[in-house]
């Protein structure tokens, strides 16, 4: 059983993902994979330097994420910079995700495997595999902005820029067969997640 899990930035997807892992799902975290491919020695880092220039690196040779974010998501980002970054990172991330899924299925053929993909709505047609179900975690935009300012050290403008560069709620809902409302009390949200996992586990 292959599940796609998505949601807007700061919507609460990580909380849902962690709950599914507790229940026994194998969660493949695409944010973690994205960090891995840009680490020193990672396949994406030299190509990012080639594309964006040496200023994308810190003095210690690691990726300057703040610089890259400003030049990809910021108000003065060069047109097409997001697409260039995605074209470097995404194929490497998909390849590693497939490897992790194959490894899990070798030991647990009927496992519920959750692909935790923040930008699923943007890339769903480009993925080399399809999902049995897709769930999206949603919260009102203003609540998400407040969370980013409070917990991620962003300014309001930076938070709005991040949201602007993601798919809209309507686009996520168009690909999903399940909506998880993260503004409901945590206990109720966990009850919904638990029911979903039981359903997926039975189908697997």
Task: Show where each model-derived region lies.
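An amphipathic alpha-helix signature
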Residues: 23, 45-49, 141-149, 156, ...
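Residue-level signal for inorganic ion chemistry
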Residues: 12, 31, 85, 114, ...
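Well-ordered beta-strand positions
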Residues: 26, 32, 133, 177-178
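ATP-dependent NMP and nucleoside kinases share a basic, alpha-helical "lid"
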Residues: 98-107, 113-147
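Short, structured coil segments at secondary-structure junctions
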Residues: 23, 52, 129-131, 175-176
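ATP-dependent small-molecule kinase phosphotransfer cores
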Residues: 35-111
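Glycine-rich phosphate-binding loop of ATP-dependent small-molecule kinases
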Residues: 1-63, 74, 199-204
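Small-molecule kinase domains that catalyze NTP-dependent phosphoryl transfer to phosphate-bearing small molecules
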Residues: 99, 123-128, 150-203
């Amino acid at each position: 059983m292959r599940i796609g899990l998505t949601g807007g930035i700061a919507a609460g997807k990580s909380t849902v993902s962690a709950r599914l892992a507790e229940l026994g799902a194998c969660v493949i975290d695409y944010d973690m994979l994205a960090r891995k491919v840009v680490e020193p020695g990672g396949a994406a880092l030299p190509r990012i330097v080639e594309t964006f220039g040496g200023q994308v690196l810190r003095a210690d040779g690691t990726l300057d994420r703040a610089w890259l974010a400003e030049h990809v998501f910021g108000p003065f980002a060069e047109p097409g910079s997001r697409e260039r970054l995605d074209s470097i990172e995404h194929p490497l991330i998909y390849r590693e995700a497939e490897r992790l899924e194959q490894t899990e299925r070798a030991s647990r053929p009927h496992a519920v495997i959750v692909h935790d993909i923040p930008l699923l709505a943007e890339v769903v047609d480009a993925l080399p595999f399809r999902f049995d179900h897709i769930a999206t975690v949603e919260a009102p935009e203003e609540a998400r902005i407040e969370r980013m300012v409070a917990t991620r050290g962003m300014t309001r403008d930076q938070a709005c820029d991040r949201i602007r560069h993601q798919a809209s709620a309507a686009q996520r809902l168009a690909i999903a067969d399940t909506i998880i409302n993260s503004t409901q009390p945590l206990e109720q949200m966990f009850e919904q997640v638990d029911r979903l996992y039981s359903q997926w586990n039975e189908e697997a």
